[in-house]
C-alpha cells in the first residue's frame, strides 16, 4: 500500500525529488522490559539466585519434615530459573547480539528520549521536501549511526536520480556512511556532533589544529607540525562496533612546549597525539558543506519531523501492534 501511494504521488508530481530529509522514530514493541535481557541483567539474576540457593541450603541442614520438603521445592524452583537465564545467556553468546527479547525476538531496548528506554523498533524514514511526504521507511532494531548509507541507496532507486540533497541530524554523523554518500555522488548534509573529548584549554581542541592534505600533516595552535609515520592502526571501538583504521600524528616539539598541560590531559606521558581515520576526508567535506549551507540545513526539522509528529501525537500511533518480528512490524508501519 505504501509503495503504491508513493508511485501515485510521483505520478501527480507531488514529490519534488530535489531535497529530502532523513530521520528515525522509535515505536514500542509488544515486548516488556522485563522480557528483555542483556549480559549484565542475566548476571544480576544469576547472582541473586545463587545467593538464595545458598540460603536455602543452609536452612536445609537443620530442617526436617514438611519444612524440608518446602525448602527443596524452593531450591528446585530457583534452579529452574537459573537454567532459563543460562539458556538466554547461551543465546547471547552464540548470536553475538548484545541483548535478547523473549516476546518479540527482533525488538531491542533503546533510548527513546532523555535517557528513557523502551523495548522498541527504530523506524528509518525518508521524507521529500516538496509536500513533506514520506517516500520510504525501513523498520530496524539498530541505532542511527549506520543507517544513512542504505537509506540513500533506496532514495536513489525511488527517485531514479542522485541529483538531490539529503539532510540528516548528528546521530547519522558516521565516516563510513559519509563515504557511501560520496560513492553514490549524493550531497548529504549531516549535523556535526560535539567533540567527545576536549583539551583542558578549548584553544587547543582538535578543531583548532589545521590539517594540510598536501603534506598530510597537522599544524597546532603554537605553530608546530604534527606528522605521521604513514602506518594505519586498527582502533578498537568496542565489542559491537567495527574497528576503524587511523593514522597517528605527533611532534617532538611537545617535549619542550610550555603550553603542554593546556593541550592534553596526558601530556606529561605522551605529548599530544592526534588520530585521523580512514574516513576523515569525507567528514571534512561534510563540515564544509554544512557550514556553507546553514539556511538549507535549517529546513530539516520542518521536513522530516512533521510526519511522525502527526502520526504519533495526533493519531496516537506510538507502538507496533504485532509481535512477529521486523517483517510484520514493517507492515504495521506501512499501513
Regions found by a protein language model. Give the residues of each.
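Anion-binding and metal-coordination hotspots
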Residues: 1-335
Amino acid at each position: 500500500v505504501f509503495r503504491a501511494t508513493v508511485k501515485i504521488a510521483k505520478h501527480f508530481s507531488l514529490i519534488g525529488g530535489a531535497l529530502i530529509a532523513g530521520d528515525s522514530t522509535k515505536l514500542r514493541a509488544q515486548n516488556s522490559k522485563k522480557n528483555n535481557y542483556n549480559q549484565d541483567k542475566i548476571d544480576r539474576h544469576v547472582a541473586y539466585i545463587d545467593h538464595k540457593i545458598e540460603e536455602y541450603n543452609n536452612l536445609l541442614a537443620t530442617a526436617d519434615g514438611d519444612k524440608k520438603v518446602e525448602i527443596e521445592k524452593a531450591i528446585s524452583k530457583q534452579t529452574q530459573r537459573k537454567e532459563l537465564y543460562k539458556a538466554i545467556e547461551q543465546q547471547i553468546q552464540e548470536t553475538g547480539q548484545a541483548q535478547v527479547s523473549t516476546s518479540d525476538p527482533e525488538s531491542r531496548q533503546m533510548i527513546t528520549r532523555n535517557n528513557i528506554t523502551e523495548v522498541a523498533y527504530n523506524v528509518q524514514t525518508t521524507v521529500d521536501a516538496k509536500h513533506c511526504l514520506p517516500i520510504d521507511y525501513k523498520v530496524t532494531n539498530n541505532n542511527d549511526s549506520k543507517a544513512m548509507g542504505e537509506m540513500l541507496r533506496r532514495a536513489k532507486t525511488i527517485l531514479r536520480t542522485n541529483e538531490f540533497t539529503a539532510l540528516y541530524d548528528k546521530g547519522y554523523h558516521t565516516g563510513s556512511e559519509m563515504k557511501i554518500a560520496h560513492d553514490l555522488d549524493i550531497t548529504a548534509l549531516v549535523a556535526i556532533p560535539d567533540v567527545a573529548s576536549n583539551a583542558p584549554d578549548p584553544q587547543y581542541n582538535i578543531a583548532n589544529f589545521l590539517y594540510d592534505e598536501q603534506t598530510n600533516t597537522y599544524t597546532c595552535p603554537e605553530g608546530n607540525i604534527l606528522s605521521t609515520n604513514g602506518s594505519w592502526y586498527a582502533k578498537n571501538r568496542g565489542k559491537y562496533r567495527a574497528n576503524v583504521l587511523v593514522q597517528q600524528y605527533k611532534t617532538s616539539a611537545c617535549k619542550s612546549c610550555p603550553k603542554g598541560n593546556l593541550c592534553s590531559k596526558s601530556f606529561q606521558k605522551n605529548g599530544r597525539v592526534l588520530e585521523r581515520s580512514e574516513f576523515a576526508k569525507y567528514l571534512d567535506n561534510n563540515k564544509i558543506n554544512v557550514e556553507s549551507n546553514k539556511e538549507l540545513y535549517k529546513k530539516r526539522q520542518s521536513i522530516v519531523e512533521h510526519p511522525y509528529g502527526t502520526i504519533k501525537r495526533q493519531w496516537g500511533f506510538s507502538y507496533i501492534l504485532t509481535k512477529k518480528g521486523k517483517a510484520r512490524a514493517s507492515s504495521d508501519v506501512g499501513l
